[in-house]
């Protein structure tokens, strides 16, 4: 079920820069680098190794404690698990995936038809496994 809300953000400045521009689909990259550290909690430990095939949405990193799982954003082959530059200026362990452009979705990704019968604990487990973090960037 999709939720909607009233309002939104309505910036007044600089709309003229994009108003007449067409929306362009951004092509998927040939290679993705997925950092195992994506929030202020503990970094994930990789669950995949060089040469492994991964599917889109497959969990590729996880760990105990204050850690949110990380998932593959493409399907393809793991080229490396190595330290790479991170946007925060550090170097972090990352999973490098060669995109196969098949967009094969992992069987781990499945819709949940009815959430109303689940306990709060079950919902929290589902949210955590999805890698969802709060505004504080800590897993919920």
Stretch-by-stretch model annotation:
Residues 54-67, 82, 93-99:
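Short hydrophobic beta/alpha edge segments that flank linear recognition/processing sites
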Residues 42-47, 64, 106-112:
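Aromatic/His-enriched, Gly/Pro-containing loop or helix-boundary segments
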Residues 87-135:
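Acidic low-complexity segments
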């Amino acid at each position: 079920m999709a939720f909607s809300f009233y309002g939104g953000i309505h910036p007044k400045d600089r709309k003229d820069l994009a108003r007449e521009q067409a929306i362009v689909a951004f092509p998927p990259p040939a290679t993705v680098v997925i950092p195992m550290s994506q929030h202020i909690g503990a970094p994930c430990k990789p669950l995949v190794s060089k040469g492994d095939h991964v599917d889109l949405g497959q969990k590729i990193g996880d760990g105990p404690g204050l850690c949110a799982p990380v998932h593959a954003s493409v399907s393809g082959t793991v080229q490396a698990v190595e330290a790479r530059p991170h946007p925060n200026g550090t170097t972090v362990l990352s999973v490098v995936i060669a995109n196969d452009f098949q967009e094969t979705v992992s069987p781990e990704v499945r819709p949940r038809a009815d959430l109303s019968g689940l306990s709060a604990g079950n919902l929290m487990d589902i949210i955590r496994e999805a890698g969802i973090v709060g505004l504080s960037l800590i897993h919920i």
